[in-house]
Amino acid sequence: MADPAQLTVTPSRHEKSLGLLTSKFVSLLQEAEDGVLDLKAAADTLAVRQKRRIYDITNVLEGIGLIEKKSKNSIQWKGVGPGCNTREIADKLIDLKAELADLEQREQELDQQRVWVQQSIKNVTDDVQNTGLAYLNHEDICRCFRGDTLLAIRAPSGTCLEVPVPENTNGQKKFQIHLKSTTGPIEVLLVNKDTSSSAPVVVPVPPPEDLIQAPPAVPSTPQRPALTPQNDIATSPAPTVPHSTISNAESQDCPTGQTFSMENTTSSRLPSIDTCPLQSSASLDNSNDSPDPSTSFQPIKSDLSDVLELPKDMISDFFDQTKECITSDLLEELMSSEVFAPLLRLSPPPGDHDYVYNLDESEGVCDLFDVPINL
């Protein structure tokens, strides 16, 4: 009888099969951290003498897309983890494919609806009867906002718009809009002007020469024009003599309706000069008062070359007194007069030193534009 110790234990054919080794290898791979497994460690764990069998398993699994090689002796699992039901994953995949097909069908329906809408819009715009209804004109906008003031504002890009909290004065709220632009001018237009009223008169400040020298309107009955501060500028004559004495009234501030009076001392030394009368701006107003007989209108010179021959001290004295008359109060009355009534001033009120810049006798163009001169 043979010794039991001498008997060799031979494994069965099932234990040596490649299928059983593959199942053990896949289980070991699924349990590895992050699905990464070292082939040398797997061969030692599975007690595989021939590593060729491990390589055969990895080649098959890589071919069907369940694993991928990370390095020469390292692989990573790409399939489902342990405990996952393959049947549930297959059912979920079928549901996702059905949902995707439904979404594609809805997308086709939306594309068809868009084509129909575009064709309908084209049919409406191409119809001749609908041509006049494709836009809004001035009257359509004004009818929608009856009793309100509409202003069209066109400002460059980057304009700052501020609307302060409205102030409640006597039960009425006063709204203000502040616009500020550093890149270009801001244009403001009045939209809802009544078509039955007269056209607005837009006059710059100060008025141009053609408006001042326009022929006066002859009233049917004697009327007295309302004298406004504008008469102070229009009725101030240019000096007609090289040397004159100014009355005491001129040395004071110019009241309303007052004109300059000069005494001629050397009129015999000047030749005869063509003159033209200066029309008062009061004749432009449609007031019912008769002209004031105390208001005098002096002629002005039509030839500027004769004026330039006058002494510089006399011309400077005249313009100095003219600047004293043009104050901020005078400009305020100009803006509030009937001639400037249609204007809506959006800029700050004028001051006393807006247009009084000049050059001394020793200054030149370089001083005007601040151009440095290197000597």
UniProtKB/Swiss-Prot annotation:
GO annotation terms (biological process): centriole assembly; motile cilium assembly; multi-ciliated epithelial cell differentiation; positive regulation of transcription by RNA polymerase II; regulation of transcription by RNA polymerase II
Claim: Transmembrane is one of the keywords in the record: no
Presence of the UniProt keyword DNA-binding in the record: yes
GO cellular component: RNA polymerase II transcription regulator complex
Compartments in which it is found: Nucleus
GO terms of molecular function: DNA-binding transcription factor activity; DNA-binding transcription factor activity, RNA polymerase II-specific; protein dimerization activity; RNA polymerase II cis-regulatory region sequence-specific DNA binding
Gene3D superfamilies assigned: 6.10.250.540, Winged helix-like DNA-binding domain superfamily/Winged helix DNA-binding domain (1.10.10.10)
Keywords tagged on the record: Activator, Cilium biogenesis/degradation, DNA-binding, Nucleus, Transcription, Transcription regulation
Region (Dimerization): 82-177
Region spans: Disordered: 197-300
Region (Leucine-zipper): 39-61
Pfam families for this protein: E2F_CC-MB (PF16421), E2F_TDP (PF02319)
Composition-biased stretches (Low complexity): 280-296
Comp. bias (Polar residues): 220-270
Motif (DEF box): 44-81
CDD domains recorded: E2F_DD
Subunit-level organization: Component of the drtf1/e2f transcription factor complex. Component of the EDM complex, at least composed of e2f4, e2f5, mcidas and tfdp1.
Stated family: Belongs to the E2F/DP family.
Functional summary from the UniProt entry: Transcription activator that binds DNA cooperatively with DP proteins through the E2 recognition site, 5'-TTTC[CG]CGC-3' found in the promoter region of a number of genes. Component of the EDM complex, a complex specifically required for multiciliate cell differentiation: the EDM complex binds and activate genes required for centriole biogenesis. Activates genes required for centriole assembly (plk4, cep152) and genes specifically required for motile cilia formation (foxj1).
Protein name according to UniProt: Transcription factor E2F4
UniProt organism field: Xenopus laevis (African clawed frog)
Lineage per the UniProt record: Eukaryota, Metazoa, Chordata, Craniata, Vertebrata
Gene: e2f4
